[in-house]
Amino acid sequence: MRVWPAFLSLSCVLVSLFAFSQGSPSSAVAPGSASASGEAATQKTEALPSRSLADVMDRVIEREHLFLAQMRHMHPMVETYIQDLKTDRAGDTRPAKDQYFLGRLDMSDGAEDQSFIGEPGFGQRMVTHLTGVFSMRFLPLGFAQMVVLDSDFQKQYYNFTYVRREFLGDVRCLVIDVQPKEDAPPGRFMGRMWVEDQDYNIVRFNGTYYPHPKTSYYLHFDSWRLNLRSGAWLPAYIYSEESDMKTALGKALHFRAQTRLWGYDLKGLGKNTEFTQILVDSPQSVKDQSDAAADASPVLAQRMWERQAEDNAIDRLQKIGLMAPPGDVDKVLFTVANNILLTNNLDLGSDLRCRVLLTSPLESFTIGHTIVISRGLLDVLPDEASLAMVVAHELGHIALGDTVDTKLAFSDCMFFPDQDSFQRLDFKRSPSNEEAADAKGLELLKNSPYKDKLASAGLFLKALQQSAPELPNLIRPHLGNGFASSKNVRMSTLLASAPQLEPGRTDQLAALPLGGRIKLDPSTDQVELAKAQTIALTSTREKMPFEIAPFFPHLSRLPNSGSEK
């Protein structure tokens, strides 16, 4: 089955043809009017060394067909976050509303998805009318389809122009412009692709699809692949943006979107390897005569039962691909938690853990004695004091004795489809529990090493409170309690001690953009702190609190992965 590229349509749509009420820019460029070949004509092209372009394209197309065959057997998680944009009176662009999707990609019979988030019926998705304002309604599958340059990639459909060699990170690439022939079937890719020069895999492609049907519109996108297996480059990031595309109603489509894919090796994240390990016990270790060999006391048994429920939930979230395996980021979070505990002379036992939820919405919660913080929240926190504020609130829950629902200790409670995870796993607390955790968290912070640095935490809360009405999906939790709502924020007492928000100052960073702090390995689901470059901001436009930015990953090959012939 052909995987049709992403587009806007009244029958098979990516975006419903309804524009929200903000005025369109004074001038508009027809989508797809700037062809890739036109850009190439303004550049000095280089001669393609050694191989002819025809030979190279034969190999590229062969590798792309192999890529499609591989993707039919993979079911990665796919997350799309979209921010509709508007221009204020000062001429600055900022989010007006947002949309979010999380699911699992299935290309075994064309591009399909298994949604983790309940979607309204097809009719509702097509036309959404909100308080008299027309809104853009995105269907997420189209963004996931941008992992494929062309599901029927053939030389007969395209004209190829070699441009130059170029490094993307550590990987030397051939840069090739791609333009569909006049007699090619509709919906063909038009733009530029980067091909690594060892095995001739496509590692990046940037452009749109062409020609544009009368009742639909193709979006522009920039799709990146990473070397996740020997000889295999798999989709990891897709960035899409439109600033002046005209819809059928004459409004301008203005948005930015990020799509991330991960969870390519979920089977490897399980414990199947332990089953095949040969373990030999020494005779001395077979029988334990120590006190530890005694039956658990009632109190210890209750703790062990709660721990079993906690472990079951964490293992299930990790197996699904929603939680990262234990790693170095957990150690950073634990260090912050330990700093707070030590200065408060608070002993929560040796079983305190910290883990990272792999999704973008801003949320944190506890599963028993495990503190869970989302990747998106870690991304936007500006400093360690702000992180301490988040951790202190969750420590408040643990110190007050808020436990996990022990029904999860029964293993059959973990038998449910992955897409039902948000309905079957619920770690929300009551409003009274949240208020008590706020109070306890503030008490812990006042006796912590962060007590004199909480102004930045309060400033973060002010920025979040200001942005919350436009970003309801970014602040909407899926497993725990919300960090903020359109009216309230967590730990709101800190607002009083925070300085005023000054958007005109480049040295005041109340919150960071999404994606700048945490790096996710799409193959192993491991997370690490990104090695961010220190860059001085040249304008307030570059502050981008809670906003989306393009992807530019540093590409590299797997160690010791030779050329696959």
Segments the model singles out, each with a brief description of its role:
Residues M1-P5:
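Positively charged n-region of N-terminal signal peptides that target proteins for export
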Residues L8-A19:
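Bacterial N-terminal signal peptides
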Residues G23-M190, Q198-N201, P211-L219, N227-A232, ...:
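Structured extracytoplasmic
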Residues H75-E79, V175-Q179, R192-W194, L352-L357, ...:
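Soluble periplasmic/extracytoplasmic beta-strand elements of cell-envelope proteins
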Residues F205, A236-I238:
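Beta-strand-dense domains in secreted/periplasmic systems and polymorphic toxin scaffolds
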Residues G270-T335, L342-E363, L378-V380, E384, ...:
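C-terminal capping/extension segments of zinc metalloprotease domains
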Residues S374, G401, D405-S432:
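Substrate-binding clefts and substrate-entry loops adjacent to catalytic sites
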Residues L377, A385-S386, E394-S411, P449:
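Catalytic Zn2+-binding segment of zinc metalloproteases
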